[in-house]
């Protein structure tokens, strides 16, 4: 039995070119795919079928990143329900792109612990309805910002799957 192959993805953080240029660059640099925010300008320029075709032609996979609460640092006035609504809309849009995986940057570190756990329970119920793997990124200003609490959170929420932000 062969071991699974590690896939390498080029992030489009800071990328200003087109999706076609990104695919060409990633392929030339021997990446297996792209990681891109769902609201990135290079995706907004195309319909879902054009995005899928561009990736397929370049033999590139896709990881979609969905950010809620307005930006990478969330608006503190954005409620848990608003974050969940934004996640739902984002997941529905992302599914049309046929990504390999979806990463969520969601929630707020300003909520108390009871609200955090209630939010995660609702969020995990929500993502379970989708057929593509969905992970939550450990990110500053977000629900999962604190690595020291992670063992307890993973024990309490065994369905939780993480993408680690090492920055």
Describe the residue ranges of each PLM region.
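N-terminal pre-domain/capping segments
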Residues: 1-89
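Short, exposed beta-strand "edge-strand" segments with a Pro/Gly-rich flavor and a Y/T-containing core
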Residues: 14-17, 41-46, 142-145, 157-159, ...
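Conserved beta-strand positions in the central sheet of alpha/beta enzyme cores
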Residues: 35, 63, 102-103, 163
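Active-site acidic/histidine proton-transfer and metal-coordination neighborhood
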Residues: 76-162
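Active-site metal-binding loops of divalent metal-dependent hydrolases
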Residues: 166
